[in-house]
Amino acid sequence: MTMPSTVAAPLMHTARDERIKRMSKFRRAIIRPELGAICGTVAVFAFFFVLAGGTAMFTLEGAMSWSTVSAQFVVLAVGVCLLMIAGEFDLSLGSMVGFSGMIFALLTIALGLPVWLSILLALTLACALGAINGILVVRTGLPSFIVTLAFMFILRGLTIWSAISLTRQTVVSGMGEAAANDPLARLFGGKVLTGLFQWLANHGVIATFARGARAGQPVVEGIPMLIVWAIGLLIFGQWLLTRTKFGNWIFATGGDPQAARYIGVPVTRVKIIMFMFASLCAAVLGISQVVEFGSAAADRGLMKEFEAIICVVIGGALLTGGYGSVIGAALGAVIFGVVQQGLFFTNVESSLFRVFLGSILLGAVIANTYIRRLITGER
Amino acid sequence: MAVPIVEMIDIQKHFGHIIALSGVSFSVMPGECHCLLGDNGAGKSTFIKTMAGVHAPTHGEMKVNGETAHFANPRDAMSAGIATVYQDLAVIPLMSVSRNFWMGREPERGVWPFRTIDFKMADRVAMQEMSHMGINLREPEQAVGTLSGGERQTVAIARAVYFGAKVLILDEPTSALGVRQTANVLATIDQVRKKGIGVVFITHNVRHAMAVGDRFTVLNRGKTLGTADRGKISADELQNLMAGGQELAQLESSLGGTV
Ligand SMILES: Nc1ncnc2c1ncn2[C@@H]1O[C@H](COP(=O)(O)OP(=O)(O)OP(=O)(O)O)[C@@H](O)[C@H]1O
Ligand SMILES: [Mg+2]
């Protein structure tokens, strides 16, 4: 656009500044935003390896169960992470999981639309609602905490009301059969690499069912689509945030919206797009749960927004925005998933789940604050 | 007479019932350093924000190269060649020097939609431009938050100069600086000016203004007290004007080009 130009140095310094300490490669490599989450992940795996090493938790079947649960958290956490780095919250995401799933089911069952069309409509609606959230926040200047809290109630209420008024129930079933042969539904449910797993089973690498209807089939048929979504979103989010121009704008928008605006970053557009993206992530989770379970329930996604925020904060993001890591958030989600499933395998009282989680949250956040100060020079 | 790069005619700015600017006229010629002086709350920052597209003026006209211009946002002003280094909001502390340097104009490579920032080039240029300004960085990824206040200003100035602004607005760039860095900034202003760029230099410090200024405009309570050319006004006279213009009558003769 403009011609770069160089101004000769008024006071040229060629020598190294003697006041700058050299940082070792190792130190530079480990001092990163995800460090707290990496340590947390290692600690959690070590903990369960000691407690539940002999149980089914560390078999392929067990691993698939905690991976699937973690993947649910990852899908939501990626959206929440980018939104939080852009400086905003969305407390309506849990309700959005339930709402988008319910809309998808109602359009298919009650209105008889083809499954693929219902999915597209549900995703579009989620995007539109995300945009409304975003526009309300940037136009009114109200904290997103309040605006999206309102939407948390509104969407949950609409979910229950629409289900009851159209079907007289809060659980809409029959989605399994409806989605069975739909081309788009296949992206949201079922498994991939089934051939590979069958091949591995035939060669004795993974166990097979010995008896019953599925005798000879592998105990793990393939990788659930939700895990594919989680990995895809994770890679996309990390790439977007750290490698692209838009990612630079996301950081700037959350770091200092006024300064970003002055230097020409379209702050409102960035925020609105991030609200839409987070809603889209919630809708992906909502729709894939419906395809997976064969039904939509009005209470799906309850409290999920808070759990996602916890994952993101464990992952090193700053609650006030401008700093964070998608990889960190995904590790936070894995910690969450492993702890939740691990306590099930170890038969520990499930109430301890909360105690454990609270402790990890506290530990990770304290570690993160310390690491962040090292990196950013916050005083 | 040459056409000013930017000319502001009778600019007013009201915030609700607060009148921050009540009719300010001002111009910047290519290659001059026009100092804008005034006490706290005089309206200096508000005035340059209308120039930079942050605020739309309530009343008044703005001309760029002799043609009427309207800026809807800071981007418009930037593409018209008006670059601004703000008093307090110059850079984003949590982000790296290199990312701050390129903010809003990131160099990209690759094919759409897989375009990414060209970090190699971005880092190299940022390091080089910073060292031209006398600041040695440990690495381009170093966060701006680890720099001192003056060094942060320098990042913003280096950025504006690098992107070839036609008008460079500096809002109190020296107020947070030490002796050496102030000398650096003043020397930079001088060099920028020699390249034909118009500089608007806001300061409280009359000595800094006298060191580089070609023209001096004093704002007081949202009004201009007048514009004086270099050599037609002394430091003491400027100081008095800034202090409230009690001795205005006495000074009127020296303010040749009163608007
Ligand atoms: N967004 C705003 N809303 C309301 N009033 C404002 C706004 N911005 C500035 N003002 C008022 O306009 C007046 C001029 O402020 P301005 O920031 O331009 O002063 P200044 O000359 O830059 O002062 P300083 O030397 O302290 O930086 C002040 O009285 C201020 O309160
Ligand atoms: Mg000011």
Feature map (PLM): residue ranges:
Chain B
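Glycine-rich phosphate-binding loops of nucleotide-dependent enzymes
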Residues: 2-259
